[in-house]
Regions:
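General beta-strand structural signal in soluble alpha/beta enzymes
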Residues: 23-25, 57-62, 104, 122-127, ...
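Glycine-rich nucleotide/cofactor/substrate-binding loop typically near the N-terminus or early
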Residues: 27, 32-34, 39-96, 219-235, ...
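Active-site glycine-rich loop that binds ribose-phosphate moieties when present
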Residues: 105-108, 136-149, 153-174, 207-212
Length: 296
């Protein structure tokens, strides 16, 4: 029923047909998460890291209304050059963007949806969306969390984006029965930094241990994904108190400007990059490289 809407690249199709590991990658980080040309350079380097480690990358996006699992270098450059002119697409946006034959960059939620359609089980991303600060009044909660509760894809990330309320994000994940596994860590990472002060309930230290847990979950008939929290490398992290101070400044500026909805995350990431004089962007790039090394 959905084959008509999705195009899987030859490289990804061959890997899936031969039961070789495939790692899905989102495209919002290309269009909205980093400036050009660092966005394209980072995306291509991530793909190279995945290939060198024995897996096949599948960068996911929507081009002219077609769901795409696996992009060419030219297509990645196209998305990167357009940048924030490309629509940021979550679950709610998919029918409109596809029907109107528009081009869109996929969030964690829509990347999970398209990955599952394509038969891809592993997805690496910098940080998931979550419960925003002040959500008790704004009700601003990312659709990424609901997707994790319903879609059978493993998401490997450096925790949730540090601009969020991480404590409430973990509470939401618990409420919806989403397993959170700390990969080599007892503490939930906070994107730019390895620490958040928030413990993870389950720690895994090897790929085999992690794979067995994921396999068991789905064999038990428990639908939904798994969040694997793989912290940023120690040498690449930003100092905890400093980055939190910069985040609070950026959040205050966003509130003063009345920025909200899907515009809030790209605005905050760009403002934090400005306030940290590029330090946050360097950390973001390094954590994405690190995440690309895990294949289950």
């Amino acid at each position: 029923m959905i084959n008509h809407y999705i195009k899987i690249s030859p490289e990804v199709s061959e890997a899936l047909a031969n039961n070789r590991p495939v790692v899905a990658l989102e495209s919002t980080i290309i269009a909205h998460g980093m400036p050009y040309p660092q966005n394209v350079e980072t995306a291509l380097q991530v793909e190279d890291i995945i290939r060198k480690n024995g897996a096949t990358p599948a960068t996911i996006a929507i081009i002219d209304g077609q769901l795409r699992a696996g992009l060419s270098k030219d297509e990645i450059d196209y998305i990167g050059k357009l940048g924030q002119k490309v629509v940021k697409v979550s679950r709610r946006d998919l029918p409109f963007i596809v029907a109107k034959k528009m081009t869109g960059a996929t969030t964690v939620a829509s990347t999970m949806i398209i990955a599952e359609m394509a038969g891809i089980k592993i997805f690496a991303t910098g940080g998931i969306g979550g419960v925003h600060r002040g959500a008790e009044s704004s009700m601003d909660i990312s659709a990424d969390l609901q997707e994790l509760a319903n879609t059978n894809v493993v998401v490997v990330s450096a925790g949730a984006k540090a601009i969020l309320d991480l404590k409430l994000t973990l509470e939401y994940l618990e409420t919806h029965g989403i397993p959170v596994a700390g990969f080599g860590t007892d503490e939930f990472p906070a994107f730019y930094t390895r620490k958040s002060g928030l413990p993870v309930l389950y720690r895994v230290d090897t790929i085999i241990e992690l794979a067995e847990m994921i396999y068991t979950k789905w064999q038990l008939g428990l639908n939904g994904g798994v969040l694997v929290a793989n912290p940023i490398p120690d040498q690449a992290q930003v100092e905890f108190e400093y980055i939190n101070e910069m985040i609070e400044k950026a959040v205050l500026i966003a509130e003063e400007k009345g920025i909200n909805g899907k515009a809030i995350t790209p605005f905050l990431l760009a403002k934090i990059e400005e306030l940290t004089k590029g330090e946050s962007l360097k950390a973001n790039i390094q954590l994405v490289f690190n995440l690309s090394l895990i294949h289950i």
